[in-house]
Regions:
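Core segments of alpha-helical transmembrane spans in multipass integral membrane proteins
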Residues: 17-24, 43-65, 72-90
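Alpha-helical transmembrane segments of multipass membrane proteins
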Residues: 24-28, 86-93, 116, 144
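Transmembrane helix-loop-helix
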Residues: 92-110
Length: 155
């Protein structure tokens, strides 16, 4: 039985899955059309979303900040918040698209682990994992599909 506080807000479901739709569309397009454009689009979108997921920690840290106390916990939260963005930025300069997909997949998996632990420790609402886990599964599946089907042009 789910308590009301454990239920995922409908708007979070709507926006979360809407945010996953470009992953699905770009993965499908990358299969249908053998153009690097769709894989590149998938990589850029994945980098943006990975950055967004890290940024959630910045917002949460600012909300929890009281009287400008820069505790060790706050420093950790702020560090966690920028790490995915820095990783994503580095990935965007990788020329080998398959390598970029591998690094993005690792980044999403690592971020999910951090989020699951943070939620279990009460940092996020109880429902957050119930939303994040399936969304991350969709993202990883799309990245795996793109990795499998993408064949770089041999010149």
């Amino acid at each position: 039985m789910t308590h009301k506080q454990d239920a995922i807000p409908q708007i979070a479901i709507l926006l979360g899955y809407s945010g996953a739709s470009p992953f699905v569309a770009l993965a499908i397009l990358s299969i249908l059309f053998e153009e690097p454009f769709f894989i590149e689009g998938l990589i850029v979108y994945a980098a943006i979303i990975l950055s967004f997921l890290g940024g959630i920690y910045w917002g949460a840290a600012m909300k929890n900040l009281s009287q400008n106390e820069f505790t060790a916990s706050l420093k950790t939260d702020l560090s966690i918040s920028v790490t995915p963005a820095l990783l994503a930025w580095g990935i965007l300069v990788i020329k080998n698209l398959k390598v970029a997909i591998i690094f993005l997949s690792v980044g999403f998996l690592a971020q999910l682990i951090v989020d699951v632990v943070a939620t279990k420790n009460g940092y996020f609402p109880h429902w957050y994992n119930a939303l994040r886990i399936p969304l991350t599964a969709i993202v990883l599946l799309c990245l795996i599909v793109a990795y499998i089907y993408y064949e770089p042009l041999q010149i």
